Amino acid sequence: MIKLESLQDPSPRKRRKKLLGRGPGSGHGKTSGRGHKGDGSRSGYKRRFGYEGGGVPLYRRVPTRGFSHARFDECVEEITTQRLNSLFNEGEEITLDALKQKKAIDKHAIRVKVIVKGELEKTFIWKDANVVLSQGVRNLIGVA
């Protein structure tokens, strides 16, 4: 037999939807649970993600961790002797701008390093201070 004290709330799926704006007896009349004035009482209002009622939100209370070096990193590219052989002709000057023009390096690069891969089949002019030669390339062309 069912007794009054043994009654349970219906499961959330069977619970009646709360009716808003249907008189003071419903508990959700007049302002329909929205309170008086302010943004929350207006139609179309949605709280910003992380908003905590005007207090300092958690994401601002918790200290930041780590450090990003991206702002200070210099964009240094590398290019092989094999690639230089295919891109440039005999006796051409190899500069940062020439490499950027031929799209051999990134347009944001501020320095390029030449590394050994295969032989250097042609002679080039190396005057640009932003084109750095590795020790192996220096040995190939005979510069100490």
Curated annotation (Swiss-Prot):
The UniProt annotation puts the region (Disordered) at 1-52
Q: Which UniProt keywords apply?
A: Ribonucleoprotein, Ribosomal protein, RNA-binding, rRNA-binding
* GO aspect biological process, one term: translation
Q: Which InterPro entries match?
A: Ribosomal_uL15, Ribosomal_uL15/eL18_sf, Ribosomal_uL15_bac-type
Q: Name one GO molecular function term.
A: rRNA binding
This protein's GO cellular component annotations are: cytosolic large ribosomal subunit
Compositionally biased region (Gly residues) = 22-32
Q: Which family does it belong to?
A: Belongs to the universal ribosomal protein uL15 family.
The protein's job, in short, is: Binds to the 23S rRNA.
Q: Which HAMAP family match?
A: Ribosomal_uL15
Supply the name of the protein: Large ribosomal subunit protein uL15
- The protein's organism comes out as Chlamydia felis (strain Fe/C-56) (Chlamydophila felis)
